[in-house]
Amino acid sequence: MQHARKKFRVGRTSAHNRCMLANMLKSLIHQERIETTLPKAKELRRCADKMITLAKKNTLAARRLAVARLMVRYNKLTSKEARQAKAGDLSVYNVDRKVINKLFDELGTRFVSRQGGYTRILKLQNRVGDNARKCIIEFLAN
């Protein structure tokens, strides 16, 4: 029996779920507002609240833990990114670093006085193709 054991299940493998949540969390931190389906947003809210709590501590250990949870890759580039870097576009190296800096410098300081509930989920109309429940997840203004 699985009493009180919440698992995020959307019909994917656990590695795919981890990577998908890390990518969605990076997008949420970078843009502060994304549109997704309701089950993904509910799981993303749990992860985002934990990351903001880490960012409020603003220690080296918290930064390292955030880098690990966001699966930040500083030296691993895809073949497309390697071609861009060879061509002189060095912005491919800075995307994840910007996300970490924004998390700790902007979002961590914005929510210092707040004890929890850093995100909000706004429900939208269902998607036309498959009738999936759509929503917007965003960080609160303050």
Swiss-Prot record:
Keywords: Ribonucleoprotein, Ribosomal protein. GO terms for cellular component: cytosolic large ribosomal subunit. InterPro entries: Ribosomal_bL17 (IPR000456), Ribosomal_bL17_CS (IPR047859), Ribosomal_bL17_sf (IPR036373). It comes from Chlamydia felis (strain Fe/C-56). Signal peptide: none annotated. Pfam families: Ribosomal_L17. It comes from the Bacteria. HAMAP family: Ribosomal_bL17 (MF_01368). This is Large ribosomal subunit protein bL17. The keyword Disulfide bond does not apply. Part of the 50S ribosomal subunit. Contacts protein L32. GO terms for biological process: translation. One of its GO terms (molecular function) is structural constituent of ribosome. Belongs to the bacterial ribosomal protein bL17 family. The keyword Ligase does not apply.
